[in-house]
Every structure is written in C-alpha cells, then in structure tokens.
Amino acid sequence: MLTNASQVLLRNRDLVKDQSVLVLNYEGDHLPKELLNTARSVCGLALDYHHHLMMQPYAAANLTLHFGHQLPNDESFDTVIVYFPKAKALAPYLFNLAAKHLKPQGQLIVVGENKGGIKSLPKQLPSYFDKPFKADNARHCIVFLSELNAAAPTLKLTDWISRYQLDTPQGQVTICNLVGVFSEKKLDEGTKLLLENLPKMRGKVLDFGCGAGVIAAALLKAQPELTLECVDINAMALASCEFTLQANGFNAKIFASDGLAQAAGRYDGIISNPPFHDGLASTTNIATNFVKDSAANLTTGGLFHIVANRHLPYSDTIAEHFGSVDVTAENNKYKIYSNVK
C-alpha cells in the first residue's frame, strides 16, 4: 500500500514521462517500482534500511536501488524526487544532493505531508533552484515543482557535521552529529541513566540503535577492551557513529540492520537506548521483537542492558524470554533493565 505522499506523486506520474528519475529518501512502499509504468528508468536512494529492504526484491535493469547517505556514482538524472524528511534539518542536505545529481535545468519534485513542514519549502529551497510552485495538494500532502538553475556548491559529508564535546559518566567524548540525527548536544535523560548504571561488560557487545555513537563512545572510553558492533537503521546515524568513534580513536564494526536481522553470531552483551518511545501498538510490537531477538542472540551468561520509558510494557516480554525482570535503576521517566541470559 502506498503512503499518502506516494499516492499524490503517482497521480502526477506524467511529470516523469520517459525520463530518468532519482527518488531520494523514499518511503516504505513500492513507489519507485510504480513509477516505471511512466518513467524510462528509476534509481532509488533510501536512508532507511527497512525501506531499502522492502524495495530490494524489485530491483531490475531499469530500477536500481541503493541504501546510504549518497549514491555510489555521479550519475545525472532528468528529474529528482525528494520526500521531505521528518527530520527537517536533513532537508538542506537532500536538496544539495538532488542538485548534484540533476542535469542542467533538471526538474525537482518535492513531496511531503502538510504536518511535516512541507508548506515552508519556498523559504527553504536553496537559490540554485527556481522558486517552487505548488503542483498538487491532496491527501494532506503537497507536491512542489522547481528547476535547477545553477550549479550547487560541492559539499563533503563532513561539511554537514555538528561536532561537540559531551560529558558522560565515563568521561568527556567527542560527538560528530550529522544533520537529521537526533541530538540534544547534551546527554538525554534516558542515556544518562543508562550510562550512570553501566555494568562491567565482556567480550563481543552490540550497541543497538547506535545513533551518533554516544553510548558506543562512552562504553569504549570505560571499557576499551570490548569488541563492539554498532547497528542502526538510518544511514546518517551510521555515518555519524563512524565519525564519532574515529574522533575518539575507537574502533567498532558499524553496519545497517533491520532490528537484529543482519546481526551475525552471538553476543556477550547487548546495550541500547532503543528508539521505541511513542507507545503505539506498532511500536510496542517492534519493542517486543527486539527483546525476543536479543535473547536469541545472546550467549549463555550474556547481558541485556537497556533503558526504556517506564510506561512501555517491557517487563512481561523480558520475563518471558529471560525468566525474570531485573530493574537495576529507575526514575520518574525511565527504567534500566539489566538481565543475564
């Protein structure tokens, strides 16, 4: 099923008739494949690994699919479609990337939900694009059109980093935060409680939902002997984590994973401030699977150490898969679950 934004794009598919099309930041549906009924060829770049995996089975000669923060080549396209990001700070990066891959006077299509900030696009679009105009407005979404009128500045990925020092219970670390990756430029409450109650870990440890690498850097600061692996579903987060660990002189294996599906082998420890916070049924289901999969991926005696919003129903699932529930610290917002398999 197509998202609302994709449905509005599809009803405007004649905009890409017989063209080469790049779709940036595509969503969890099959829109890139659907565009092939009109476009000559389609290339998709997903920044969300789950979205990439959903589309991957449909890859073909005229439908190329990539995951990451940029394309592996300098190919140019007649049209670039940008899904306006939920993290608004990511938008300028996507516009610059779109310009890099557009032919001169190439067409830019931007789609987004009204509640997601798309209405402010005319104020946000860089001057190397023409002033955008509204092509469609339906299903609580807007489609804007523009055209590339000048070459965009050539920017490296490092130009999009916010670099700052962060005090943790394990000492000061350097954080390299790319646009679009969650950051408060200070320890968020949940991570602070997690690190204040950091146990001695051993062997091979997995940092699930690593984000910009705050937990990873603090953990290696205190326990550099660990073999650490860091996973996330977001391409910008994975790159941020890599920059953060490099800045602190640490090494870890960093890779994309949809849940724990791509994590290979067993771990002696799993640590996380898991990104499941809203309490919706779908989110609760993902959190439940995370606990179940963590238990399956831990060695005997392995440690499961996470922080979670205290209102989320982790206890029953942890008891089911670990045999007991060990809350080692808590406050009025968060609980630390620290269970041995």
From Swiss-Prot:
Q: Which InterPro entries match?
A: DNA_methylase_N6_adenine_CS, Mtase_sm_N, rRNA_ssu_MeTfrase_C, RsmC/RlmG, SAM-dependent_MTases_sf, Small_mtfrase_dom
Q: Which reaction does it catalyse?
A: guanosine(1207) in 16S rRNA + S-adenosyl-L-methionine = N(2)-methylguanosine(1207) in 16S rRNA + S-adenosyl-L-homocysteine + H(+)
Provide one Gene Ontology cellular component: cytoplasm
Q: What class of enzyme is it?
A: transferase
Instruction: Please provide, alphabetically and separated by semicolons, the GO molecular function terms listed in this UniProt record.
Output: 16S rRNA (guanine(1207)-N(2))-methyltransferase activity; nucleic acid binding
In the UniProt record, does the keyword rRNA processing occur?
A: yes
EC number(s) given by UniProt = 2.1.1.172
Pfam families, sorted: MTS, MTS_N
Q: How does it assemble?
A: Monomer.
Which HAMAP family does its entry note? 16SrRNA_methyltr_C
The name on file for this protein is Ribosomal RNA small subunit methyltransferase C
State the organism named in the record. Shewanella halifaxensis (strain HAW-EB4)
